[in-house]
């Protein structure tokens, strides 16, 4: 894998704007599923509570391949109760896709997440979704997004954001909302055109744990983006806990994301998102780092998602 061709993106929006549906469209277009496999809509909503409520609570990781690019995609919560989850995730990506409903426009939660993305210097790609709705107003919604970004202090470059129109549900994206296409290639082309590849940083390894996964076979799995250096399968590492304590442990397996699943690998370089298997004790916000010279990354705020 050419690590200059890895792109990390997050999909952010208010609840019901179509985030999970868009991620599903990425996966379907990239032929993640075989012809005889049944594709369940809202593939990313795998948690039982999420399927029951029809909203995304926890961030998920998957990846698609497009024109020799590996695109790591994080589908983030859109519900206001989980804003810290969103804030945590956008710090691991190269840019965000800001998805807005073509009838409703940007909502309060959109404002919060967008502000966080702008503050750390990300330039969003704006997708005006659901343009097939009879009450859609895509041009007005575009102006609303521009005005919102301006009010949030966006730079001149950030205000020059690309905008794509389409219907994730119907599997198309294009430049003109009045001219439906038959795929989402226009959005994928825009992603690889405007998003810079991650910068590789040499040195002792560092990875901030930004989310957790779980396997019945291996237990808890640490997920995050390698910030510096190289993580290797079987290497001895230190875990710098948020309270300042440092523990020594060993990586049993390293996985990258491929489609909806994990792919075991020997090494992961800086800039890629990976899953680390076999660590003893860890939490979100801890740093996996060099065994001999442990160096923590700045911690992140944690709020446990709760729903009534």
Show the residue positions of the predicted features:
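P-loop NTPase switch module centered on the Walker A-proximal segment
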Residues: 1-100, 104-106, 144, 212-215
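Alpha-helical scaffold elements adjacent to nucleotide-binding pockets in ATP/GTP-utilizing enzyme cores
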Residues: 25-26, 63, 85-88, 92, ...
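Short beta-strand/turn micro-motifs at beta-sheet edges
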Residues: 61, 85-86, 113-114, 262-263, ...
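Conserved C-terminal guanine-recognition region of P-loop GTPase G domains, centered on the G4
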Residues: 96-158
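Flexible hinge/switch segments at interdomain interfaces of large molecular machines
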Residues: 119, 164-165, 296-307
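Short, hydrophobic beta-strand segments
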Residues: 125-128, 171-173, 304-308
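Conserved catalytic-core segments of large NTP-driven translation/proteostasis enzymes
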Residues: 150-284
């Amino acid at each position: 894998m050419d690590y200059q061709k890895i792109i990390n993106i997050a999909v952010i929006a208010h609840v019901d704007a179509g985030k999970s549906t868009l991620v599903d469209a990425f996966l379907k277009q990239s032929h993640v599923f075989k012809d005889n496999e049944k594709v369940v809509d809202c593939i990313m909503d795998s948690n039982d509570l999420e399927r029951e409520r029809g909203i995304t609570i926890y961030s998920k990781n998957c990846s698609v391949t497009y024109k020799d690019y590996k695109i790591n995609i994080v589908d983030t919560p859109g519900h206001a109760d989980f804003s810290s989850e969103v804030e945590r995730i956008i710090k691991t990506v190269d840019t965000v896709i800001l998805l807005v409903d073509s009838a409703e426009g940007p909502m309060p939660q959109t404002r919060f997440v967008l502000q966080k993305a702008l503050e750390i210097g990300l330039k969003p790609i704006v997708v005006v979704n659901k343009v097939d709705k009879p009450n859609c107003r895509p041009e007005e919604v575009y102006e609303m997004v521009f005005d919102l970004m301006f009010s949030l202090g966006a730079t001149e470059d950030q205000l020059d954001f690309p905008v794509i129109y389409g219907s994730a549900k119907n599997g198309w994206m294009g430049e003109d909302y009045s001219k439906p296409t038959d795929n989402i290639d226009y959005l994928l082309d825009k992603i690889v055109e405007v998003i810079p590849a991650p910068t590789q940083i040499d040195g002792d390894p560092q990875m901030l744990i930004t989310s957790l996964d779980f396997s019945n076979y291996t237990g808890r799995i640490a997920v995050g983006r390698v910030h510096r250096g190289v993580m290797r399968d079987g290497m001895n590492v230190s875990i710098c806990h948020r309270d300042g304590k440092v523990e020594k442990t060993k990586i049993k397996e390293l996985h990258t994301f491929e489609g909806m699943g994990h792919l075991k690998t020997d090494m992961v370089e800086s800039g890629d998102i990976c899953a680390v298997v076999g660590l003893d004790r860890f939490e979100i916000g801890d740093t996996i780092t060099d065994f001999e010279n442990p160096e923590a990354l700045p911690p992140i705020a944690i709020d446990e998602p709760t729903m009534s």
